[in-house]
Amino acid sequence: MHNRKRKTVKKTVSFSDDQNLTNANLNNHRKGHIDDDTPPVYVRKSWTLIPFHLLALLYWFLKYTDFNLLALLYIMIPTQVIYLIFRFNKNTIYGKKRLRLNWLLVFITLGACLLLSIPCLAIIVLFGAPFVELLKESWLLALHCCFLTYPAVYDVFNCNFKVGYFKKYFISVVIGCWISCFVIPLDWDRDWQAWPVPLIVGAYLGSFIGFSIGGYI
């Protein structure tokens, strides 16, 4: 008589009461955890995210304020908070749900942006900004850059520090500043060429573009 070889049966041990959940976990393991690659946080594609208020502020700054950086900052900060509450937060999805507004975090993020202006100032100075004679102007530039990214900073805190997704909003401000630098050395002798007015304009335009198309990138 021929000895028949018994087929070995692979046994799995599960501590879950839900057999369907166990099967789903096995399927995910076989697929190589494809679901892990999907981003847990994203911003919806919507025209309501276009920050028209930044263009309005920029027009007012260039037309009527005699390039008053402090006055522009005082108005920009509350408008950014309003933009976060009624636009950016409502279009931010974390996992499969829309995030509720965390009022405490709204105010904490304001303080965080203020603190972030210090390392931002250091970076600006390292890239050649005047430090001694125009320190106030350089710090105002750092403050504008940090508060322009205020909605993104809030979502970084509110979404478990998912910096990777929101870094594009910071990069857009940096690129705007960098591109606008070319007008400063031009021999035009215009008031708007004074430090750091061109970089402020570039930062606002970069932020406008970044928040407008951020959901599509």
UniProtKB/Swiss-Prot annotation:
Signal peptide: none annotated. Pfam families: PIG-F. Glycans are attached at residue 20. Pathway: Glycolipid biosynthesis; glycosylphosphatidylinositol-anchor biosynthesis. The keyword tRNA processing does not apply. Disulfide bonds: none annotated. It comes from the Eukaryota. The chain crosses the membrane at residues 41-61, 66-86, 107-127, 139-159, 169-189, 197-217. It is found in: Endoplasmic reticulum membrane. Keywords: Endoplasmic reticulum, Glycoprotein, GPI-anchor biosynthesis, Membrane, Transmembrane, Transmembrane helix. GO terms for cellular component: endoplasmic reticulum membrane. One of its GO terms (biological process) is GPI anchor biosynthetic process. The keyword Endoplasmic reticulum applies. Its main location: endoplasmic reticulum. Belongs to the PIGF family. Acts in the GPI biosynthetic pathway between GlcNAc-PI synthesis and GPI transfer to protein. This is Glycosylphosphatidylinositol anchor biosynthesis protein 11. It comes from Kluyveromyces lactis (strain ATCC 8585 / CBS 2359 / DSM 70799 / NBRC 1267 / NRRL Y-1140 / WM37). The gene is GPI11.
